[in-house]
Structures are given as structure tokens and as C-alpha cells.
């Protein structure tokens, strides 16, 4: 291998990706985007394609995969170790892992093996690196099985594994050489042998070669099993000398090779194809034997290639016709593919390539399975994951690129069969090239482990398969499907334990090629919550929408996109990272490498409870140029503290480099404010300002600080704060003492805690109804360095100073509050979606003295969510665990009434049977116990949740004709003799947020006339796995499918009207199906129209009605009226039937016609129609 110039890799303290980023343009929390460490390498080597944080006894490192290192020829790929936390910057070092990554006893092809494209750390120390395009040669075929290596903590390859298989393209080749004196020069024959043998993979389980030389006698130069490698055979072949002799006994040489060289004693293998290559330069002296010798070779299936060297004839100017015909007769059929001739010995090397290709073609025929690949092209190691017990290796190329997951544990390797991951629907329409194993992961649940694999090309929309390992067998539990064709749903999987209880809380599934509204590859991440052994959809995450502009002519474009495709590919990398913001919950980082015209960006989402917050906490853009540095966010890892500050750091890779971002500590700052006096009493002035008496107030503001990561240590913080008086008013009613300003700004250094005092005075204003709000805003003096403020806590504090109570001349205010409540619904709430609203109207009235700080407190059941308020007259509501609404603040006067509405929405995570609300009205004023009974109201309203499903029905036939002249068969031997088949299909598809309940589907159809004649005959039904239909006695009740013969009587004629009135008189059969909860349920019923009944019946046309009725088995989960029933009408008509009109109809019609004629004649007579005016004129 030609030595290659090592890539120039330098570590710089400032991340070169972020030089062009302005801090203000990105949402920032506690990942430091200014002071980072970067590692750069050639973009053409894909340096940065994978990254992992790593620690061993030598120190802390960033491991970086570079799958195409070795440009421009070998491109084996490799892994670099990049030191961090050292006093001085040190370069990254290539580990040269492919050199020691090897599988014994195979001919390896490491070029383009993309080693380092998969890189995962081992929880027990060391790491795993894979080259999914590693191949080995089997004959002339290259099998891309992929390979993975366990690397020790000291960066040494411990062992390598790949699903290599024994080559089944084996050949036993015996070369029969003419060594007579006429062969000249002999060196040309040896050169021919060398060129031919170099092209063969020689070994005990591959091709074996033996050489026989003949002239007057036959010599075995070496046997088939003599040498076990190509190199050994070449050495032996170079030592072969010419035997000599005056005669050429070709038939003897061939027959000896057949009888002796192809025996097991000389290394021939049973069942292996036999090949003989005969090289000669003249006619044989025993050609009379050739015909029988060749027939014996044919009988033993020996393929023969014959080579005629014409040098002796050309040098003697002799005719070659007879010689060529003899050598052609030796070759196997077809002769044109098995016979060669060369002008002389020197020209032998010119046919080596063609001869080799034709011999190699026999290898392919020896392995008939080569047409359909199993693990030969598996690309094992395309993805990898360490679970508790198993190492999971994705093998996307297995089974004709359907893919599989190789499970390895210690020395055990489980390679699932092609059908192992096929679900029942998939067997009917087997997916091709679904790439199962594109990514793999696992989830830990109490007492078990779930294994997860993605197949992004399944059914073109993608799928995720969840399964368990039970005694080495795979048991599929669930599949999750994508929603958009080509989105690559399932190409990225990550599981995460948010609350650190050792059990998985979420599964995140990436669909990085999800198309946005403008056909840009926006990308999408689906979040699923773990519920026992199943995953339930929770939410979707999307990036900032990218504007795709190929030309600046578009007015909305501000920057032209130079790179295609446009978009973000959000979800290309999804990493579960340890608690970044030190809030006790683990976090998620998602890469969007195509953002900003292929520069790339990442998004950080903080964990909360058992899920993540839907809004991202921080977006880190690359700032790269999209060429020398691009696809920032291609790889992410954040598991370790690499600089010793106790905080998790994040490593982000792209093509051309990687960056290590340090996390900043989180400062917890809490502020309290107290006032003396704590109420404003205008009647009691306590100071003079500018010669006027007024009310002065002393404010004490205390700051308490600590670091989240070091709560027990003393922390000193430099803060800047600003105090604003009467902050709710545009014009303030108070100023700070000694100034005429409502605002002051100061700096303070706080060591654990510190209190300061400020005084202010009230202005002579007449508006003293609303309290005075004092607002204190604070921030760190240097927000770009050191810790950051906790974003879970406010950096603004508000306190209200109320005015003194107005109770007239009384010292005590005795209020009497009443609370009246009404709701929009009283008897039953039907909830159709989480956006449905439920209003509660509250009326608070004070029948006593002024009630100060009047408020209503609302407690509600967890199936309700506070949405907002309407029509409130004063102030507003706050919602924490309870809803507290200030009513008439600061006081509710005597006789005053306030009415407002509280609006609720429904929490789809808690489906309770009742909506329960407890409301109370209270104040800071006194109220007698006997008047408190009207201060509280309890509401309990039953709730039902309308499941958003879709209920479809269809039939294969809607009209069937019965010929009038059709005859009734004497016997019914099979269902084909009964009549037309009608297939009825029912589909129930889940929609909406509510879970699917257990359902009951009742399918009714007319099966017998009133006289007991069959109408529709059920021959069977089928359904999805979650459906169970009964009774089975309805299925083929006459047993016709079982071979029972049925005799039909032709003499009977149905009473008139029996069929015509079938809708009301026919007997009805009902199939009842129980449906377990599923996103999709299907039931198909096959019915036969019993034609003998309709042939003997009198009718022209009628409808048969089939009814499907759906019912929920859960009293809380109901169905909408539009999704409960479905009816299908099948029209039956009789063709060519003459109409038979009743006699009374004929007589009545004749009488009516005569009566009408008489009336017409009478009318004409009355108007003189029958008089002749001309006759009267003549008479006159």
C-alpha cells in the first residue's frame, strides 16, 4: 500500500464554526457558544461524520470517525483520538484501526470499507468501531458483509467480527501441460501459469489447483490439496521444468488426470465442480483413444478448456487444420467458449484474462444462491448499540437489502431469518429494500429490555420495529409507521431516561427528509412515551422553517441558497445527553445539518418530568461556509464532563470537523422584597417631601444565590438589578426618595445572601384603588462568561403594596361574600378533542363591608386544564396547582358584584369519568362562620370522551342480475354452484388524541326467507390480528366447503312477495366481532347470493340490506353518532321476466278508459261539436 500523507488536524481554542455567529441571533442558555474547542480535518475524508466522548487511564478524549480517510485510493476510513483537558493543545492522532481489523481465513477487501462510520462507546470500557462496506472475496465475487471491531481502553483492537460465510464457489482445477520437446520457450508456459494462477483464490475451502505434465509419460507435478494458498502454488509452479520427449500422448495425459488427479486421495472434494485445462502444441500420438477418453470425462462432469499452441506448426510452415480440429474435440460444449488457440508460446499470456473469466463464470454456477443474497451483502455495522445484554448491529443489506439486526452476546451471535421481522400484513406484500437495521437502540423497562430497529424505506413511509429477545428468539411487540412517503422515518432512533430512574421514558424517531410545505427537506422528530411495553405518540418536534431561495428575484428572499437540497434535515442526529442545565432531568440534542445553506445547526431540548419541553431551549448555529465545513449537527454526543467542572459537555460533528462545547453552570438567584409599612394608608402620613406630608415606604430587598452543581459550596455572584415603582402604570404614583425618578439601577456583589434598602414616597394622587406594584429585574453583570441564570426561575420579581382598608369608622371590616356558579353543560360533557372548551361562570357579590384582596380559588380534577378567563372586570387570574383570581382588587366594595368566566380545556392524558371543580370565594377581611356556607360551590359533571375514529364499509358487489331463464341446479357440490360472491369490508381507523377502546362490531345480513329458504350464505370471514369474530357456526353452515353435497328441490315455488318483502320478513344473521384497541382494524366477510331462492321467486328488483353497527365497550369512551352504523344495499334484479298484471287491475283500467271516453263525447256534444251549421244555412 502506498504511504499516504497524514491529514493536518489542529486543535484551536476558539471554534472556527462560530467565528461568524453573532450571539444575539441564537436562543442561548447554558451551552457556551463562544469558548469552545474545535478539531478540523479534510471534508473529503468525511472527518467528523461520527463523534464520541471517551475516557481512559491516559485522560479524556474526543473520538472522531473519518470514514473516507485514505484518499484517493484506499479510503479505508479510520478513527482519530483527539485529546482534551490538556494544558496545551495537541493534535489528533489517527489510530490505524483497520490494520488490525481482520477476519482470518478470508481474502479481505478493505478498500472503501468506510471504517469509523459507526462509532459507539462500550459502557464497560473501550469502544466499538465498524466499517459497513468491508468485503471479502469469494472467487471473483466480493461480499460486502461489513465488519466491527472491539477496541480496548488503550486503543488496541481486541477482536473483530463479521458475518462471513464459507465460500460455496469452490472449484477443483487440474491443468494438463504438454511438456514435449516441441514446446518452446518453456518460460512462456510458466508465465502463462503465473498470470492464470494469480487470478484465483486458492485455499482448502476455495479453489484448488493441481498440475499434470505429460509427453511420452505422465507426471503429477503437485496434487490438488498440496498447497493452501495462491502464493504457495505460484512458488511451486515456477519450479516446474519441462519433461521433454519425442511423443505427445495427449489422450494418456487427459485420462490419467481424470483417473488419478481428481481422486480424493489427491485432494479432490466431493460435490465440487471439476475443471481441466489442457495446454498442448501438437497432434497427439494416441488420438485413436481421444473419443473414449473425452466421453469418460463427460460421464464424470469434468468441464474442459483446451488451448492449442500453433508455434511449432507456424515455425515449420505446416497446416494447422487437423491439429485445431483435434483440440476442439477435447473442449466442452459450447466449443467457442471452451477452446482457445494462440500463434505461439509467447502469446499464451494474451488469453489469460478471457480464460480466467470463463473459469470464474463456473464459480457463479456453483453457487446458485448468489442470485438472492442473504448475509453476503449485509453491511453489518451500519448501526450499532450496546444494550444491557446484547450488542445490536444493524445489517441493512441483508436479505436483498430488506435488512436485519444481528444480535451478539459474548461468543453468541444471533442472525435472524429473513421472515423473522415480517409482520402478518407484510407477508402478503413483502417489502423490498426496507433497510431494517438502519439504526438500532433499546429501551429499559421494569424487568425487561425492549429492542428497537428502524427500517426507513418500509412501504416507502418508514417503520420502527419494537421486539423482545426470549431464549434467543425474537418476539415482535409493536410497529410504528411513518406518515409521509420518502421521509425516512425510522432512520434515526434514540431512547432516553428523562427522570434518571434507570427506566426509559421516551423514544425519539427521526424523519430527516420529511417535506415541508415548500417541498424543502425540513425534517421532523416524533416523540413517543413508554407505557409498559408499548410506545404511545406524544408530540412532534420541528425546526425553524428554512426559506429556500434559488434566486434573489423572490421578494421574500434575503440570501440565495447555493447548495441543494434545501431545508434542514432536522433529526439526522438525535442524542440523549446527560443533564445539561443541572435541573435533575436529562436532555435531548437534535441536529439539523442542512440548515443555513448546509452550514448546519443543532437544537437543545430540556427534560421535564418524564418528557421533554416542546420548545427548544437553545439553538446553536454552525456559522461554517457549507463547503470546507458543512453539515454541523451530523453527529452528536454528550455523556461526559471533559473539563472537570462537574458539568456535561457536548461534542458536535459535521463534515470537515467537530467542536466541543462546554456547559456553563447554572446560578440560582432568588429575590424577596418586604415593605414597611406593608400597606399604604393615605390617612396616616409619616414623612414630608418638598414641604408636603405624604406616605413614605422602606423597601428591603434580599438576594440569595447558589450554584446548581455545587449547592453546598459558597458562591459569590456579581449582579445588576433595576427597581421600577408602580410598574403597571404608565404614570407612576410614587418616586424614590431624594429623586423624582421611578427607576433605579445598581450593581451588587452577593456572597450567599445580601440585603439592601431603598425608600420611596407616594405622590398626591387621587387614584388609590389599585395597589402599587414594585418590580425588581436582575441579571448577572457578565452574562457571557461564567454561570448563567436558571431559566426555570424568573429574573423579575413583583410585589404589590395594597392600600389600607376602607371600613368607615369601624376598626374591623366584616365582609359577607357570596359565590354563584353556572356552567355551559350540566348533565353530560361530550369531549371531542383536547381543544374543546368548558366554561364556568362565577359571580362574586359582597353583602358586607369592603372585602380586601378578594379572590376566588378554583381546584379542578386533572382531566381539566386552565385555558383562560373572559369578562373579568378587574385584575386577572394566576394558575399554578390551583387557579387564583383576584376579584375587585384591592377591595370589593359593599354591594359590589363581579362576574367573569373561567375557561377550561381537557387534558387528554387523564381521562376521568367526571369533571370535578371546587370553587371558593375568600378575602383578607373577616367573615362570620355562619355566612361562609355560600362561599363554596362544588361541581361534578359526567364526562364522556368521543373517540376520533373513522368507520368505513364497502362491498365488492352492489348489483347482481338473475336471468329469468336460469335453471336451478339439482345438486350443490361446491360454493361455486351457489351464486355470486359478495365481499363486505369494514375498516376502523384511529384518529385523534383519545385512546381507542375495546369495540364490538355487529354485522347483520338477511340469511333466510320466512319460508326458510337461504338468501345470503356466509362462507367465511377474515380480520386483523386484534379482531375475534363469532359464532363460527355461521361460517359455511351447510358444510359445502367440507365436501358435503346438497340436493335442491326444483318443484317448490316461493309464494309471491316472499322475497320482495325480505327487508321485513327475512330472518337476519349476526356476526359479532370483538376488537382490541388498535390503530387499524379490519373485518372482511364473504357472502354468497343463494341463487336457487331467487330463481324460483317472482320479483323484478329488490334490495338486500347489510348493516354494520359499532359499539364501545368502555363507558367513558364513546363513539360519535356518525361512526356507529353503516348500511350497504345490494340490488338484486331479474332480467327478462315478463310483467304479470293482476286481473282486477286490467278490468279497472278498461272501465276507467270507457268512462273517460263517454265523458269526452258528452263534452263535445255540449259544445255543439256534432251539429252541422252548413246544413242549417242551406235549409234557410
Swiss-Prot record:
Ranges that cross the membrane: 1143-1165
Extracellular-facing ranges: 29-1142
Subcellular location: Membrane
Binding sites annotated in the UniProt record for Ca(2+) 1: 497, 499, 501, 505
Predominant location: membrane
Subunit structure: Heterodimer of an alpha and a beta subunit. Alpha-1 associates with beta-1. Interacts with RAB21. Interacts (via cytoplasmic domain) with PTPN2; activates PTPN2 phosphatase activity towards EGFR and negatively regulates EGF signaling.
Family stated for the protein in its record: Belongs to the integrin alpha chain family.
Protein name (record): Integrin alpha-1
Gene label: Itga1
